[in-house]
Amino acid sequence: MKAIVFAYHDIGCVGLKALEKAGFDIQAVFTHTDDPNENHFFSSVARVSAEMGLTVFAPENVNHPLWIERIREMKPDVIFSFYYRHMLSDEILNLAPKGAFNLHGSLLPKYRGRAPINWAIVNGETETGVTLHKMTAKADAGDIVAQEKVTIEDTDTSLILHEKVREAAAKLMAHTLPHIASGNYSTTAQDESQATYYGRRCADDGLIDWNADAKTVHNLVRAVTEPYPGAFTFLGERKMIIWRARPVADNQGKRPGTVISTEPLVIACAKGAIEVITGQSENGLYVQGSRLATEMGIVTDVRVGPKATAQVKRRQRVLILGVNGFIGNHLTERLLKDGNYDIYGMDIGSSAIERFIGNPRFHFIEGDVSIHTEWIEYHIKKCDVILPLVAIATPIEYTRNPLRVFELDFEENLKIVRYCVKYNKRIIFPSTSEVYGMCDDKEFDEDNSRLIVGPINKQRWIYSVSKQLLDRVIWAYGAKEGLKFTLFRPFNWMGPRLDNLNSARIGSSRAITQLILNLVEGSPIKLVDGGEQKRCFTDINDGIEALFRIIENRDNKCDGQIINIGNPTNEASIRELAEMLLDCFEKHELRGHFPPFAGFKKIESSSYYGKGYQDVEHRKPSIKNAERLLDWKPTIETRQTVEETLDFFLRGAVEELGNK
């Protein structure tokens, strides 16, 4: 059976040898070039492959069409992935008629993602293992073929556990590969309700939090000890690395981080304490704990913890243009709640942000982005993160005012992008699900889906192509001039303060606001083209949490990324949304204030939006990037969103009636 192997690390070497022993005909091996900044405690797949006489490649992007074609020419029966660090496209996976299999270092569905061995120790697990599973478009989510369990002892480090997992992998493959070769194997679907996902770890994750209990600190020490960068703390500005430690039961009533004794070196945790067995200063030798205390001048009752200067770190400054809009005002609320941000905002009105006026961390000016260019340039220079949320984003305006859409959505935003390049500022740009246009994929993928729009005489696409062109310009600035950016694509976000009923009265609003207006006024609900178009509705709170995590940008994982933010499980047609809204309306406590329901009315899109409109049948996001980069999943169902949105507008309408 002809096999192509994607492999790296010790597990990759174990996999290659197991395949050879099982009689697989390995056509080629794809691996990675070694990173000079990485501690290579593991064997080289390239070297082992060469010694086995195998053909080896290390492409930067194996999913490039040229590499896909080369793999197709090899005509593999089966594909194996052993600790290969890049996702393989569906096009590659579909080239193997007998299937594609991945070996993962955990007992799936637990610990999907990166560094599962380290994470298992950090979290204090007592058991892990290896899983061989079918590969799918979603990372580590395919049906399970086989698993081998591994016990984690209290004294195991990541290196010791890695050796155990390597032995388990060899045992699993020796037993399972012959069954795959014969086609005589069964699979078990993963239980998604039990799935957990963890991202990559970096050296900074080794910072010790002495407010944790002693067992938690000890778990961190053994998870990141050699060959990893180590767990660390600071004495003032000086770094102290702890390589080996043991938990102690009694902290003697000391505050977390307080040195209880120096011989042995014992440091208090919130519960219990840690005895430092070995460690070193940043530029010192590997020594015993008591010797480390002497070298660093550590004395009893001194406190260690975060770096002294880190404790006086200033808040990040975020500039939000269009701060009074739907996303802008909800994002402001989330940032202020966090407490680590100063928000500077501009908009032509303030109706949605009046609740923030007077907050010392919220700074607002009423203004127009096309006029107040000096203020904008100054604040881009002053702030750390820029979010230009100003845009015309209501479908009727695409055909009614196409030139204004282009001028604001493209030209004015291009100026802001160029200021960010000029002053080397990070921009988080709101792309749109509209850029996918009439894409025919079942799920719209940020990295692979085609962006398909209609002919020139269909002017509704001017919004889509304006946004798409800005996406491409921003990407080019990132590639050529080092612009730090993230593009996010909202999929039908809904919630309180989405547009307002006055904008709905002139047709310039999103679908749910227009539907609510029909109910409030007792006019027929208009279903454009029968309302059969399907969308995936996302609660504003889910969306804002994802956007907040993009702003946080832990480990800089969001730099240079495009991220769909939507809820693929909340798919419904506009007609179904209207029926759900009607049901909530009839059950609402304020129902008696409004006229009887006037029924549904089917209309053609041209009579509603005007000449030049064209609609899309479905728009479902792939959210694998959001899951991987943000550790985010939407949780709120459409009905809850509809109820909260309806309640907001009905209470506003009743208040308006009372003021007349």
Curated annotation (Swiss-Prot):
Binding site for (6R)-10-formyltetrahydrofolate: 114, 136-140
UniProt-annotated binding residues for NAD(+): 347, 368-369
The keyword Hydrolase is assigned to this record: no
Stretches for region Dehydrogenase ArnADH: 314-660
Protein name: Bifunctional polymyxin resistance protein ArnA
Domain of life, per lineage: Bacteria
Swiss-Prot/TrEMBL site (Transition state stabilizer) positions: 102
Organism: Proteus mirabilis (strain HI4320)
Lineage per the UniProt record: Bacteria, Pseudomonadati, Pseudomonadota, Gammaproteobacteria, Enterobacterales
One Gene Ontology MF term: UDP-4-amino-4-deoxy-L-arabinose formyltransferase activity
